[in-house]
Amino acid sequence: MTIVGLVIQQHDGTILFQNVREYLSLDKAHLAAKAFKNQISSYDENFITKGSISHLTGSVVVLNMYRVYYMILNELFILAISQANDNPFEGSIYLARAKRVLWSVSKDFTTTQINKKYTEVYFALERVLFGEDGVEVLSQKISEVSPHQPPHYNTHHHTSTPSVAPSFITGGSTTPPPITIFGRLIEPNQSNSLSNSISNSNSNNNNNNNNDSININSINSNIYQTTVPLTLSNVLNSSNFNNNNNNNNNNNNNNNNSNNSLNNSNSNSNIISPSSSSGNLSSFNNNNNNEEYNNYNNNYNSLDNSYSLQFESLMRLEQSNIPEKIFTQPNTLPKIDKHIYDPPQTIKWGNPSVSHIGSSASSTRVTNRIMFTLRHPNAGKEAKEKEKEKENEFKEQQEINNMNNNNNGANGNSGGSGNVIIGSAAAGSASSKSSPSTSPLSSSYNPSSPETSENSFSATPISDSNSLKNSIDNNNNNNNNNNNNNNSGDTPETPKRKFSLSMGTFNNSKSSLSTSNSNISTPDNGASSPLASSTSGSASSAAAPPPVPLTNSAKTKMNFLNF
């Protein structure tokens, strides 16, 4: 998917919606939208108010990096951002879907009506950006579209108290209602309800101290409105049910104080509990109440421990520090070796185009494209001048050889009889050119060779001197043509060009000169023909030019495109 950003922008440059994918940041999308506005303004001042509609859709490359597909509506621009080298027709479907979303909200494409359903349009464009049709979002409820908000927690949890007193205070058999703390419902155990006999303590006892004791019967639901947190265990430990300053205690009170003191050192409670109020705690003057009070003490400890475990876990969760990087997305994503836009791996010119994932170098989008180097016409000026000098020297030497061949042919014909010619010119040219002998009188004569079939040997008497001269000239011309054909590989003629696209060099393991000269056979000087022996001595003075030596280190340009 090439579209990495959708922007809804007003004609004055105000951005209404800006949806981006992970490959494009919000800052870059903003810069691309701003550059688009500046670019179309520089094209024509009346760009928006033109009469024709051909300009209402199109694509523009901005910042030399991004291609912006645009659609001009009544008051808005719809911009789809992609990479600069993507297909220019790629973003048309995104523009059509985004236009459909805006049209379903406002038929006139006005900004005020679109802003009324800002959230629905935002999530609809988000779906359009990921390749879906976003119109169905507009028919859904907002709770189904947007992510659910977390519940609102009361941060002042130490002041929130239950509205009903728990059963271990009132002595009721009903279970206290659950308490909502940190958004969780905490329900106490069913075993926390105590018997009603605890509240039926002896309230008629005269041994009451107003300052040093607590009257359980005086505690009612009104104490839960206080804001000072104090655990009941600490209150009971502070009183200890002992009154050392009271001199009016009887024996029953002394026994009760010694046997029924509360020792709740093992309970470290963090529960919310009522504060102490001014009241009296009556002493138990009957031994029958000892068992009931012990049951009350055990049940209270179990309740205190269960609450402490639940609150400790919650407090530990509340005090834990969560790093901020969990809630924030990094500005730059980690780069991977194989990007999502990379082409598949192909092999051209002997090398893989796309590097493997394990390689250190990361691939790019143009790895499978051949990069050419443009050579200037004067790039190899010195090499060209040297080639021309060698070519001129070779042509001069070739002209000298042709003149010698013509002279040798004339001398050979003057020494024989004027009535019969048996390939005299061919024999003379063969010795000077060091080519295979085609004379039927030589020892190396092969009647099946193509050279023999090509050269016509006439044994008929010719009396006309003009005809003899014409035949000699024709044979010399044929030999000169063969000489040029054999040496055609020595002087490669390259066409004149303005410039060329070249790629790479290669080494010459064997030059064309060495291969062509190695296949040339030497003439047979020991021929039985007196005509051939007479011409060989005079032709030995004009030998073939030596080949130009080329080393293996010499390099030749491979020009495959000529202009």
Curated annotation (Swiss-Prot):
InterPro entries: Longin-like_dom_sf. Transmembrane segments: none annotated. It comes from the Eukaryota. Residues 146-170, 192-213, 235-298, 376-395, 428-563 are annotated as: Disordered. Residues 379-395 have a biased composition (Basic and acidic residues). Residues 460-473, 552-563 have a biased composition (Polar residues). Residues 428-459, 474-487, 507-543 have a biased composition (Low complexity). Component of the TSET complex, a heterohexamer composed of tstA, tstB, tstC, tstD, tstE and tstF, which may act in plasma membrane turnover. tstA, tstB, tstC and tstD are likely to be the core complex members with tstE and tstF acting as associated scaffold proteins. This is TSET complex member tstC.
